[in-house]
Structure formats: structure tokens, C-alpha cells
Amino acid sequence: MTEEEIFNKIADMISERFSIDRDKITKDLNFQNDLDADSIDFVELVMDLEDTFGAEIPDDDAEKLQTVGEAVEYIKSHQN
Amino acid sequence: MKTIAIDAMGGENAPKAIVDAVLKVKPKLRDTKFVLFGDEEKIKRLIPEDKKDRLEIIATSEIIVDSDEPVKAIRRKKDSSMVVAANYVKSGKAGALFSLGNTGALLACGIFIIGRIKGVERPALMPTLPSAKSEQGFNIIDVGANAQSKPEYLVQWAQMANFYAEKVRNINKPTVALLNNGAEDDKGDPLHQEAYKLLKETNLNFIGNVEGNDLMEGKADIIVTDGFTGNATLKAIEGTAGVILRLLKDSLLNNGLRPKVGALLAKPGLTALKKRFDTARYGGAVLLGVNAPVVKTHGRSNIRPIYYTLLQIDKMLSQDLVGEYKKYFSKSR
């Protein structure tokens, strides 16, 4: 999957989950500051990413993911 | 046929008390199948050959224990009885999940594996407690699924509890009250003031604020509270009741002959009181707002509370509680 495809999938997911305009989602979007995501939102998102991309994201790695761009980069570099 | 997924390894008396309760309730619930998750050998040994109908065992190799950190446990112990049972429910093979194990992990299974109902902001945990006024007791929601709450969450919890009280407890137009630090309309912090306003605008039978000392009086059928306060309140009720009963027993039995004779004479009254405050028949605490009922009973439970919890789960499935929630919250989005 290309970086753009991964970004589009994640952006769709965030738009649906947090009810925000798809156009407003950029790679700089910060989960905590821009989405007001609490710990439940964040774990749901990480598990959704695992299901969608068939990847396993260990807790230590998940804690480091703060922006959409970082999530895209992580999925891209951990693709099978 | 309805199907209940049961974590057979949770709680102090697992798997025996759980299997015994299932065997006891099975003849009463003829349209229900029970799937037990856990140590296959241990579970098998407890089931007589002629009682295997509508029972299935799914072998798992791990157990989530009370000391496990909930979210980490459900992500790491993938072959634990609780997680495998939750995934079974997620796949649609069972309609409800029941466990006596680690409460935090069970909530995490509900929220993260079985998943929230679309339109529900946050699931919440709701037990039924005894009250002085009614044998039906009262519901209190949320008792700790959420450490932080918003006013809108409290309104959704009241709506879910309202459905439950009507459909499962058969209460017509249940009364709903907000737990607050005073009865007047403007009491409380901004969260509770806003929740009060929003609850008043709903079509619920909202009767206003109640204080902590009103709860056990049974002033309302449903008490809505933020998860932090609800958890502290539940623990205070449980702790106080436990201490009073212990002290009462101690003072009657360890103060010579007269109190002992008095206790004997008062026995019918004490038995009636015990029956009134018998929490076992109310079943377990339900996590409402996820795609299937997730139910927790105390880890120390013996057969009786487990038996009643299975009846309660069966009723939730018969009434299609989750289907009702899905319909309601898809409309209100």
C-alpha cells in the first residue's frame, strides 16, 4: 500500500470516528490536541488501525504515535 | 436460539461455581446455548455425560488475573478465556459476554473488542442495588467505566438505563434522578449543572437531583452519576453495609447470653431484612452501550448470584436490548 493510500484510509477512519470534516485532516493533525482524544478514543483508534491494516502495534510504539503523519509512517514501515 | 459466551476461568470459585450455575439454569432456559471458555479438561470434568446438550467448551490457554493491567492484558493475553470469549461475541456467534474476572479487563473487552454502539459516546457500567422502598431496587449508572465524564454522556446513560428498567425490570415509566450535592436545581459543579439542564429537556421521567443519603431510600428507579462519583458511591455503600453487618453479628454473638437470646428471637425479622437486601437476585452489573451485553458478577460469587445473572442476561437477549439501543442511537445521531 502506498503512503497516500494509507493516509486516505486513516483519514477516512478519523473522519468517521471523530465526526470531523475529511478535508480538515492533514498529516500534522495531533490526536490529543486537535481531536481532544482521551485514552479510550486513542486505544480504540490503535485497535482499529490494527484491524484495518493487519498490523500489530505494541503499546510502547502506540504511545509514541501523536499525529496522523506518524501513524501513516508507522503503518508504512511495518507493512508485511 | 440465544447464545451466551461465558468466561469460565474468572473469579475465586472458577470454574466449578460457574459450571454448576450453568447446569442449574439450563433446564429453565430451554432456548439458550452456553459456551464456556477456559481450561477444557477442568471444565469437562464438571459436566455429567447426560447434561451436555446446549453446552459447548472452547479451550483457551491463558487467564487474565486481577493484578493484570486491563488494556495491556487484553492486548497481550490473546488466548485468555476472557479475550477469546469477547472475540466470539464480536464475531456474532454469541449475543452476550459474562465474566467474574478482572473488571477493568472485562470493560476493556467490551469497549475495545466488542465495540461501542454507533452513536453512543461512552459505554457505562450499571448494577442494580437494593432499596428500602421497593423490592425491585434501583439502577445506578455509571459506577466506574469512565474516569472522566461529560454532561452528554450522562444523558445517554440515563436513556440506556431507562430502556433497561422498562424492558428487563418491567418498571413502567421509571423515575430518573441525578446524584448531586444538593436537591436544588442549581446545585453541583458545571458538569452536574449542565447534565441537570439536559436531562430536564429529555422525555425521561426526570425527577431532579438526589443526594447520597437518598439512594438507598429508593427515591428513584434510576440514579445517573459521573463514573468517578458513581464508583466512590458504590464502594461506600458496599463497605458500609459490610461493616454494619459484621459489627451487628459481633455485638450479638460476643456479649453474653442476653444478646444471643435476643438475636434468636429477632431471627425472623433479621431473615426478612437479609432477604430484602439480597443482591444476588438482581444479577450482575451490565456494561451498557456496547454491541452486546457485557455482564460482570462479583469475583467471590458462588452459584446463586451466577444463576441469577444468567437469567438476567437471558432476559436482556430476549428483549433485544442492544437492538433497541442501536435503533434509538442511530435515530438520535
UniProtKB/Swiss-Prot annotation, chain A:
Belongs to the acyl carrier protein (ACP) family. Keywords: Cytoplasm, Fatty acid biosynthesis, Fatty acid metabolism, Lipid biosynthesis, Lipid metabolism, Phosphopantetheine, Phosphoprotein. Its main location: cytoplasm. The modification O-(pantetheine 4'-phosphoryl)serine is found at residue 39. Residues 1-79 form the Carrier domain. GO terms for biological process: lipid A biosynthetic process. The gene is acpP. This is Acyl carrier protein. The lineage of its organism: Bacteria, Bacillati, Bacillota, Bacilli, Lactobacillales. It comes from Lactobacillus johnsonii (strain CNCM I-12250 / La1 / NCC 533). Carrier of the growing fatty acid chain in fatty acid biosynthesis.
